[in-house]
Amino acid sequence: NESELERSVRYSDFSLKKFFEYVQTKSWFKNTIFIITADHTLYNSRTNFKTTFHIPCLIYSPENLGAFKSNKTTSHMDLVPTLIDYLHLQTTHSSMGKSIFLDSDGFAVFKFGAEYIILTDQYCLTNDLENPIKLYEIRSDKDLKHDISKKLPDIAEDLNKKLLAYLQIVTYSVAQDKIYTAN
């Protein structure tokens, strides 16, 4: 009588076990950094903020990476800068993300349905570019039911400016082919 989510977790656990049993026999295993993450949650398990936007991410290196836990809000765009930072590489890279090892607040920007969302450790701001923005305090309002943009207009406006600037930079970079230069 397992739920779909429980079956999925059990299968993922089994698959990862089999994968690591196999790769740990390879000579390259101890010098490899593994990133285990998801691209989205199960759609039918989306009942509140956490089940909608929270996905796991595990960075595992058998020989190199000590234990580290971050509760910082991050996104997949932070993976490349995090690895570059961890490996102490001096390189130019094309990424809108930031290393999770930096001593700075994390945030994530994404599109969910018709809404653009900027997420911080404390707030979620939504903007569909047509209606008034909405701001939620995610620690106390996990269902995102209580818009507090009128109570905290400065925070709402600051986050909205950050969101719009981010979207503008991404749009310009893609339109001008500035994301990656081969040489």
Regions found by a protein language model. Name each.
Residues 1-183:
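Solvent-exposed soluble domains appended to multi-pass membrane proteins
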